[in-house]
Regions:
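Structural recognition of the beta-strand scaffold that forms the well-ordered cores
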Residues: 70-72, 90-93, 135-139, 161-165, ...
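Extracytoplasmic/secreted envelope proteins and their assembly/folding machinery
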Residues: 63-66, 73-78, 125, 129, ...
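Bacterial Sec-exported substrate-binding components of ABC uptake systems
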Residues: 2-79, 188-224, 268, 276, ...
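Alpha-helical, coiled-coil/dimerization segments enriched in small aliphatic residues
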Residues: 233-260
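Extracytoplasmic ligand-binding site segments that recognize negatively charged/polar headgroups
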Residues: 98-100, 140-151, 159-185, 218-240
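Structured C-terminal subdomain patch of bacterial secreted/periplasmic proteins
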Residues: 27, 173-188, 193, 197, ...
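Short, solvent-exposed loop/turn elements at domain surfaces
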Residues: 56-60, 77-82, 98-103, 230-236, ...
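A short, structured surface patch at a secondary-structure boundary
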Residues: 70-131, 135, 139-141, 253
Length: 335
């Protein structure tokens, strides 16, 4: 029986691959979309600016809301859950052993339960083809040959793709406004702008108030890092969190992607934010900065090493406001 099920699965996979790879595959996908989107909202069509898998700008059009979504990473998935799209997600790839995964299940139990397939870490192209998506939302790195393949391959088959611009340095200098564009794009794609506009208003109002309150303060040197036993990953001012730091009156002095322990000590910033992916990462980071080799650092001596979830600082999406507040608390603990 088990062998028969396996054989049927591979036959189904082969049939779906043939659909996608055949010359008429695109038309069949369009037929599928039309069949499932009768009575589309007058909100559509929607035009969106995004990027292709090489990082070049591209323009996509949605004739209707996506019906079969494949999505990568926690914050992108959370965005779709908040916007009530759980029943449209046919595949979600993320770290299922992290604290963020457990948090999503706990925070959005009903919406999360609607997600058809949750897959550990990555989805290959053959697996994605079998899911029959009409929209793929992912980082640029996910559109590599060993995973989804190029965005053009999917576009040629009638599948819209959206590359999250604040990941993988698609933008050389990403800002909070770039993250706001992602949130706005999702609101427009799924016709949920009432929700996204409310968040965007909160983000912009919070930053305006913070910038006014911190005006005239002495600038602080800040490092935002990840430690995992090897080199130390440095989030420089080219990332969204770098823009958060800058707008809150700080600066990140180091520009290298990776730094060593000696460089960390010699930099001696006023405050350090150590980002972590899971509980193990948090405990590892805490133990790392307890090392005697860091005792001379001001941030260590003054209790200004703060541990924050990586989802607050990297492609934060709906966590952008949480990230801003966490950075502000760490930089201005008495405010």
């Amino acid at each position: 029986m088990k062998n028969m099920k396996k054989a049927l699965f591979f036959l189904l996979m082969a049939a779906i691959l043939a659909l996608f790879l055949s010359p008429g595959g695109e038309e069949k996908i369009y037929e599928y979309a039309e069949k499932h989107t009768a009575g589309a909202s007058s909100h559509y069509p929607v035009e969106i600016d995004t990027y292709d898998s090489s990082g070049a700008p591209m323009h996509i059009t949605f004739a209707h809301a996506p019906m079969r979504i494949v999505v990568d990473e926690v914050n992108a998935l959370e965005t779709l859950l908040i916007l009530g799209q759980g029943d449209k997600i046919v595949g979600a790839a993320l770290n299922t052993s992290g604290v963020s995964y457990a948090r999503l299940k706990q925070t959005y139990p009903q919406e999360f339960a609607k997600v058809e397939h949750v897959i550990q870490n990555t989805i290959g192209r053959e697996q994605a083809v079998a899911l029959q998506p009409d929209f793929i939302l992912a980082w640029k790195a996910s559109f590599a040959p060993r995973w989804y393949g190029s965005t053009s391959w999917w576009q040629e088959r009638g599948v819209n793709t959206y590359v999250i611009a604040t990941a993988n340095h698609v933008l050389q200098r990403a800002t909070v406004e770039d993250e706001c564009k992602f949130i706005d794009d999702m609101g427009r794609i799924f016709d949920r702008q009432e929700q996204t506009n409310a968040l965007l208003d909160d983000i912009r109002a919070s930053l305006r108030m913070d910038e006014e309150a911190m005006g005239g303060r002495a600038p602080q040197s800040v490092l935002v890092v990840e430690v995992d036993g090897g080199d130390i990953l440095n989030y420089d001012e080219g990332w969204v969190v770098g823009d958060m730091v800058r707008r809150l009156g700080g600066h990140i002095p180091l520009t290298g992607k990776y730094i060593g322990e000696e460089e960390l000590v010699s930099c001696d910033p006023d405050v350090i934010f150590a980002a972590y992916n899971d509980e193990y990462g948090k405990h590892f980071s805490e133990h790392f900065f307890e090392g005697v080799r860091f005792n001379s650092m001001r941030a260590v001596q003054n209790g200004r090493v703060h541990f924050i979830p990586v989802e607050y600082v990297y492609t934060p999406a709906f966590k952008t406001l949480d990230g801003i507040r966490a950075i502000r608390r760490g930089m201005y603990p008495d405010e």
